[in-house]
Design a protein with these regions (language model features):
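SF2 helicase catalytic motif II
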Residues: 255-264
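Conserved RecA-like ASCE ATPase "motif II neighborhood" in helicase/translocase motors
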Residues: 214-224, 237-255
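N-terminal pre-P-loop "Q-motif" helix
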Residues: 25-51
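Walker A/P-loop NTP-binding motif
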Residues: 39-41, 74-87, 107-111
Length: 264
């Protein structure tokens, strides 16, 4: 059985007690058991001189099933964050549903941050197609402007974009450049149709990276920078598996420097 140090034990116990008291909760036996299992498992990880895992056995993998009402998210997040900080590793929490991601990012992690002494930053990882490409947006609007000029000469011709689409694109431009929107499709105040979003969504084929004139104001790379400085990264299973399939560290932290939690 893995042995957890007194310091690690006190760190987790103190923060759990602080979290319970701040929220007015009572300790649950099943939650405490789950916290202990995860803490002991991570405490048993042996690192080599380069900070990499020295033991390749499966003893540092836990499969935990807990009933409704356990408080599973806190039961894995609190000890995993504490141990990741202790081991100087990143924590990647992977979920199956958008709802659970939003619960983590908007409720559970802010709650832990505010009601414990754990000093950590977190970010939500998404595929690049969820972000606005400023260059594509500007090019689309330039096309609209040129088409409008042509129509004054040839009024019988139709614009390539519907009026409603033009209004959508102009609104995106105003909101993003005005700082009222971060370029994430999911944080838009209004829905945008798939075809309209596809016109301006970031994609690998058209992205020129640091060579782009809009690189310093790129929504995608701002989000990627946030991931690099985050201690806890929330993602979905598809993104995690795709990143690992590409060798790792394309979007998410390097796998050898990470602790992974797969929630359902």
């Amino acid at each position: 059985m893995q042995i957890i140090s007194d310091h690690q034990k006190q760190l987790i116990q103190a923060n759990y007690s602080q979290w319970l008291e701040s929220n007015g909760y009572q300790a649950r036996r099943s939650q405490r058991e789950m916290i202990a299992i995860i803490a002991r498992m991570l405490a048993g990880v042996t690192l080599d001189a380069e900070g990499l895992r020295a033991d390749e056995s499966m003893q540092h993998v836990s499969l935990i099933e807990a009933g409704t009402g356990t408080g599973k998210t806190i039961a894995y997040a609190l000890p995993a964050i504490a141990m990741a900080l202790e081991l100087d590793k990143k924590l990647v929490i992977s979920t199956a549903t958008i709802n659970l991601q939003e619960q983590l990012v908007n409720v559970d992690l802010p709650n832990l941050q505010a009601n414990t002494s754990l000093d950590f930053k977190y970010a939500l990882a998404k595929g690049r197609q969820r972000y606005l490409c400023v260059n594509k947006l500007k090019l689309r609007l330039q096309d609209v402007s040129r088409a409008a000029g042509d129509l004054t000469l040839f009024p019988d011709e139709e614009s390539s974009l519907a009026d409603a689409t033009v209004v959508q694109l102009e609104a995106l431009d105003q909101h993003y450049l005005g700082g009222r929107w971060d370029g994430d499709q999911d944080s838009l105040e209004h829905e945008i149709g798939y075809e309209d979003w596809r016109l301006v969504a970031a994609d690998r084929a058209s992205c020129s990276g640091k060579k782009c004139v809009h690189y310093s104001n790129c929504a995608l790379f701002k989000a990627r920078d946030a991931l690099r400085t985050a201690d806890v990264v929330v993602a979905n299973h598809d993104l995690v598996l795709a990143d690992l399939a590409m060798g790792g560290a394309n979007i998410l932290p390097p796998p050898e420097q990470s602790i992974f939690v797969f929630d359902e």
